[in-house]
A protein has these predicted regions:
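Short, glycine/charged-rich "phosphate-handling" switch motifs in NTP-dependent
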Residues: 101
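Two-component/phosphorelay signaling modules centered on CheY-like receiver
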Residues: 13-31, 98
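Conserved acidic segment of CheY-like receiver
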Residues: 3-14, 19-20, 51
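C-terminal output helix
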Residues: 90, 108-117
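Receiver (REC) domain active-site loop signature in two-component systems and cognate sites
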Residues: 57
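Active-site beta3 strand of CheY-like receiver
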Residues: 46-52
Length: 135
């Protein structure tokens, strides 16, 4: 069984390190990008099983990256968890309409992010024959 591929996209190096720390005991291939443009290129190149995406970034923000992903045949169904310091119903509604699976307010607890990632990865693997859940 191959390890799940996860892409972390955030302009804050500190936040990328926090995501990396959250996954320290989670067996996966973790890729990183510093903005939406880098993130889109990394997603196209690596075909991640899940993307942890920051909402507000320079160059290309999370919503623009998400819209571009939804127009790409290979990425349009890739699950996304959006991270943001913004606690706005308008933002949450916007990204939900774009298919974001979950929305986490920064700063986040490692266990919260990891439980959401584990749930999404396990749901994605369920249709595959006899794939054991990741822990």
């Amino acid at each position: 069984m191959s390890l799940p591929k996860i892409l972390s996209v955030d302009d804050s190096r500190t936040m990328r390190m926090m995501v990396k720390r959250a996954f320290r005991n989670f067996q996966c291939e973790l890729f990183e990008a510093a903005d939406g443009a880098e993130g889109l290129a990394a997603a196209i190149a690596n075909k991640p099983d899940l993307i942890v995406l920051d909402y507000n970034m320079p160059v290309m923000d999370g919503v623009t990256m998400l819209r571009n992903m939804r127009e790409n045949a290979e990425l349009k169904r890739t699950p996304v968890i959006m991270l943001s310091a913004e606690d706005s119903n308008e933002i949450i509604s916007t990204v939900a309409r774009l298919g974001v699976r979950d929305y986490i307010i920064k700063p986040f607890e490692d266990e919260n992010l990891l439980s959401k990632v584990t749930r999404i990865i396990n749901l994605k693997r369920k249709p595959e024959t006899d794939q054991p859940p990741v822990v």
